[in-house]
Amino acid sequence: AGGVDTVSLENNHVLDMGDSGLEETKETLLAAGIPYASEGEPAILTVKGVKIGSLAYQTFGGRHDELIAKVPGDIQALRDQGCDIVIVSYHWGAEKDYYPNDNQVRLGRATVDAGADLVVGHHSHRINPIEYYNGKYICYSLGNFSFAGNNKPSDMTTFLFQIRMRLRDGEATSEAFKIIPCRISSRTDYNDFAPTPYTDDSSIEVVLRTLR
């Protein structure tokens, strides 16, 4: 069974309904028992005794160097609060790009070097490759999922990223991951906001080839 356990609120649409819309979103999430992460507001979730911290940022305005300097302190602050696993989410890159730019790679790798256990990116509306760097994974873009309007998007491919981590002597190690290639809609003629796993080999291969 799937579900939503934590939400990132860092993206370029978060203020589409103004400050009041953002505050209502936060209140709704908290009322549902779902912690959210935004810059300056980390989320902490405990699962089976494991404390997971989430950080979220957006890079618009060329903030890569600023964040390379800032994020290590934020990661350490979560460690100081007892977090066993730290996940960092970035809203970054350019729309419709299938590959990360040099600044994304620099920031993603610096984030792992600073102690993040997983880096997850989004914004391009396209899936991007996954990098295995210093024992950790950087998902440069998850693509769309339940998004993109009612018309048929030009690219409907997406995927689920499942990772299994194990704590060894207080350190999280990435043991295995699984990719579930999907289409953002159960239909092919328009978007019905019902993400559906692919079953045909050719579509699955398209997703996997893009992620390599």
Where are each of the predicted segments found?
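Acidic, metal/ion-coordinating pockets
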Residues: 1-212
